[in-house]
């Protein structure tokens, strides 16, 4: 979670976002409906091995940060539905299953939105390096939840009803059209299910220099990915929220923040009806 503060500040300073603090609404009961209540209680109390199931040593500060992220998820969803586009400066959702967290994901805030908006069709466009196995688990629990995951590492995901997997077994650096085609197919799925809200997992870990990445995107290709996504979604007037998802390059300020700022810049550009042409046009 170390990157969240630097990205939020940079997005605001560059004029790409207006920061809104979560309302402080109580999401505890919602999380106990979403996940096994025993797991939620273990994480909130910090007692027992389940408290560290996401993959880090439990601390009160981590707990409070995770809860703020979930509050932000619902705030961003509400804002996107009302205003067209919003972001939650957050990560750590798509590997969390009903029973427990894992791989640094504590609670599945993607599925949380589907739970809290049962009357809306929620589509997760997951463009992280890793497949959204936790979200796939919740698709079996929520009929209004759909997913397309474009990944280099599948994490056990497989094609099933309302969950499509586009796996890139080798780097796409020299074969960008393969990724573009997967995006276009995903857009078709979004239209076919008449999505009321799209949650875009705009991972930075597909980048060619990411220590956990295998997809091999260049900075320019990641920019093009974000541009294509927002121009389609906002052009179709589909309410859209995005989250940062993965990204693990160091140092954060020099390597990671610029990649995430591209996502904010492309969202703002599409919202205003403009078209950025190159990452160098992104204000840092």
Label each residue range with its predicted role.
Residues 1-111:
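Metal-dependent C-N hydrolase catalytic cores
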Residues 74, 78, 87-235, 250, ...:
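Conserved alpha-helical scaffold segments that buttress catalytic/binding sites
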Residues 246-254:
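Short, flexible active-site recognition loops that position polar ligands and cofactors
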């Amino acid at each position: 979670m170390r990157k969240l503060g630097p990205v939020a500040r940079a997005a605001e300073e560059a004029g790409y976002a207006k920061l809104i603090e979560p309302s402080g609404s109580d999401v505890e009961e919602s999380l106990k409906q979403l996940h096994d209540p025993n797991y939620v209680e273990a994480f909130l109390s910090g007692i027992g091995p389940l408290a560290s199931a996401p993959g880090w040593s439990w601390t009160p500060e981590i707990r409070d940060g995770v809860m703020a992220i979930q509050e932000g998820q619902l705030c961003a969803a509400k804002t996107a539905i009302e205003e067209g586009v919003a972001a939650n400066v957050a990560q750590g959702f798509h590997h969390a299953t009903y029973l427990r967290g894992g791989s640094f994901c504590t609670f599945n805030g993607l599925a949380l939105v589907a739970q809290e908006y049962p009357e809306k069709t929620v589509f997760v466009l997951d463009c992280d390096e890793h497949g959204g196995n936790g979200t796939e688990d919740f698709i079996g629990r929520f009929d209004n939840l759909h997913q397309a995951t474009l990944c280099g590492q599948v994490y056990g995901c497989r094609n099933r009803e309302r969950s499509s997997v586009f796996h890139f077994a080798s780097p796409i650096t020299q074969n960008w059209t393969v990724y573009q085609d997967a995006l276009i197919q995903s857009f078709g799925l979004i239209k076919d299910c008449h999505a009321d809200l799209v949650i875009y997992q705009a991972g930075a870990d597909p980048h060619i220099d990411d220590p956990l990445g295998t997809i091999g995107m260049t900075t320019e290709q990641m920019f093009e990915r974000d541009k294509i996504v927002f121009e389609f979604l906002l052009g179709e007037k589909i309410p859209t929220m995005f989250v940062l998802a993965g990204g693990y390059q160091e140092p954060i300020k020099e390597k990671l923040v610029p990649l995430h700022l591209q996502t904010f810049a492309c969202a703002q550009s599409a919202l205003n009806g403009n078209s950025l042409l190159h990452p160098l046009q992104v204000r840092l």
